[in-house]
Amino acid sequence: MRRTLYRLMIELTNGRFTSYILRKFAQSRLSSIIIPSYAKVFQINQDEMEKGLKEYRTLHELFTRKLKEGKRSIDTDASSIVSPVDGVFADHGPIEDTKTFDIKGKRYSIVDMLGNEERATRYAGGTYMVIYLSPSHYHRIHSPLSGSVTERFVLGRKSYPVNAAGMEYGKEPLSKNYRSVTEISSDGEHMALVKVGAMFVNSIELLHERDTVQKGEEMAYFTFGSTVVLLFEKDMIEVVQELKSGQELRLGEKIATRLAHK
């Protein structure tokens, strides 16, 4: 019953008109009125922001803010996979040979997430990692490794919450929401960086257009908090053992080791 009521309420409020109004407000100068309250409620770390709070003219500018130079360091070990974002480590685990994985009691299909069987097949038997970005986090997304970009594509139309309630009661938000996917080949192995849109504010803006990417290089930004899913081929990585669900991660922090480089 809770799941049914939750989905009904989301469907009633999650329309194009609502999204349009919220997006327009966030991009308007009028939204600057609530910036101080927003920063206080979500406890935004103002010491790390590139500009002072009063210099942001709209909520959109605050959402997509940059950090001061030197506030994040990228792990330089050739064998390391780094966190592509500031966020909360949600979970990791194996991708079954059936091209599915389980998180928070819900089964997700890689075929659904990536849009077809061919893309999904290369990740069968591999590893997934999920990182959640709250409204307080830095919203820019960077590359977790160096390599060649093999494909960029967008799937889905609407987005549903990816917070705790959304993960429990929603309908596979990680594989059904609007999402932007970048696949990267590195030393003959593939990984997919899946950027999942948030409810109401779907926008994921791509900033990287070249065929190659360096570890830690900026690739995109969310216009609100959301989630990234990392998919790796079989025997490609070993997740850092100390990582725990609910742990805060910082951009550039080592989260896994490349097995081919050990």
UniProtKB/Swiss-Prot annotation:
Site, Cleavage (non-hydrolytic): residue positions: 225-226
Pyruvic acid (Ser) PTM positions: 226
Membrane topology: Peripheral membrane protein
Record keyword Membrane present: yes
Name of the protein this chain belongs to: Phosphatidylserine decarboxylase proenzyme
Class in the EC hierarchy, top level: lyase
Function comment: Catalyzes the formation of phosphatidylethanolamine (PtdEtn) from phosphatidylserine (PtdSer).
EC assignment: 4.1.1.65
Subunit structure: Heterodimer of a large membrane-associated beta subunit and a small pyruvoyl-containing alpha subunit.
HAMAP family: PS_decarb_PSD_B_type1
Active-site residue list: 86, 142, 226
Entry-linked InterPro entries: PS_Dcarbxylase, PSD-B, PSD_type1_pro
Organism (species): Bacillus cereus (strain G9842)
Cofactor(s) recorded in Swiss-Prot or TrEMBL: pyruvate
Keywords for this protein: Cell membrane, Decarboxylase, Lipid biosynthesis, Lipid metabolism, Lyase, Membrane, Phospholipid biosynthesis, Phospholipid metabolism, Pyruvate, Zymogen
Main location: membrane
Gene Ontology biological process terms from the UniProt entry: phosphatidylethanolamine biosynthetic process
